[in-house]
Amino acid sequence: MFAVVKASGFQRLVEVGSVISIDPTNVDSGGFVHLPVLLLVDGAEVVSDPDKLRLARVSAKFLRKLRGPKVRIHKFKNKTGYHKRQGHRQGVYVFSVTSIERGD
């Protein structure tokens, strides 16, 4: 069984045991988060009805906090000698999907 969930504005394809990284949310260390389900596939049966998906649940356990890849920003103006260099690393939370429930 696998599901498509909405996490941090993106759609992720997950199954039990998969590890996903999303933008920081309000969760304690070792805490759980429930992700909204957009599509559920159980063998040959596909569930896409919004009323049934409201009952479905994907639980994920918080593993660790990381920092994403470095993004370098460089501003430059021609003929003036102006340039500015800056970097940024976005915080990322890593979760492990522990269960997918249909909720019927």
From Swiss-Prot:
UniProt GO molecular function: rRNA binding; structural constituent of ribosome
Protein name, entry field: Large ribosomal subunit protein bL21
Subunit structure: Part of the 50S ribosomal subunit. Contacts protein L20.
Any one cellular-component term (Gene Ontology): ribonucleoprotein complex
InterPro entries, sorted: bL21-like, bL21-like_sf, Ribosomal_bL21
GO BP term, example: translation
Keyword check for Transport: no
Keyword Ribonucleoprotein among UniProt keywords: yes
TM annotation in the entry: none
NCBIfam families: L21
Lineage top rank: taxon: Bacteria
Keywords: Ribonucleoprotein, Ribosomal protein, RNA-binding, rRNA-binding
Its biological purpose: This protein binds to 23S rRNA in the presence of protein L20.
Similarity section: Belongs to the bacterial ribosomal protein bL21 family.
